[in-house]
Amino acid sequence: LCDRYGVDALRYFLLREIPFGNDGIFSNEALINRINADLANDLGNLLSRSVAMIEKYFGGTLPAQRKAEPLDDELAAMVEALPAKVTACMDVLQVPNALAEIFRVIQRANKYIDETAPWVLAKDEANLPRLAAVLYNLCEVLRVAAVLLTPFLPNTTPKMAQQLGLTAESMRFETLGR
């Protein structure tokens, strides 16, 4: 299984699907469905789209000038609350719930892309500060998710950090909420 799907994907599936200390049901179909839904469609899609848009619209580097809007507040609040939610779940060994919390924010970020339509913003140079804010928010979701997913996906998250151009310091748990 590890050779076919990868250690991180298998570890993620087992931790996401089987509550700690309990028996669980395994099937190849369930494994493939979870990998496709969470890791490929949600996380992979968010990372791929975000990195591609930063490269396409800003040459790989986000400008400092950004224009935030009220639509950003919900996503920012979810990201800010996420480390405490994950920690609370982990404190009582509710690993599947911790992972569900992380992926709830990732799913919200994918919806945020559709709501903010960065490809439309990019058509007008006057919207570039707004576009920068949208892409910054997506990068922050990905950074926080990568930090929180590191214990579960230790081979995957360094690759995410590299694609996002994150420093080792920004990948430390202690940096969350700053």
Regions found by a protein language model. Name each.
Residues 1-70, 166-178:
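Catalytic adenosine-cofactor/nucleotide-binding cores of aminoacyl-tRNA synthetases and other
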Residues 19, 37, 63, 70, ...:
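Proline-rich intrinsically disordered, low-complexity coils
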Residues 47-86, 106, 110-127, 131:
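Conserved, charged catalytic cores of large soluble enzymes
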Residues 9, 30, 74, 78, ...:
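Exposed alpha-helical structural elements
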Residues 23-28, 80-88:
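Short, charged/polar, low-complexity loop and linker segments
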Residues 24, 88, 93-94, 103-178:
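Basic, alpha-helical terminal appendages of large translation-related enzymes
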Residues 1-5, 31-42, 67, 71-79, ...:
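Secondary-structure capping and boundary motifs in well-ordered enzyme cores
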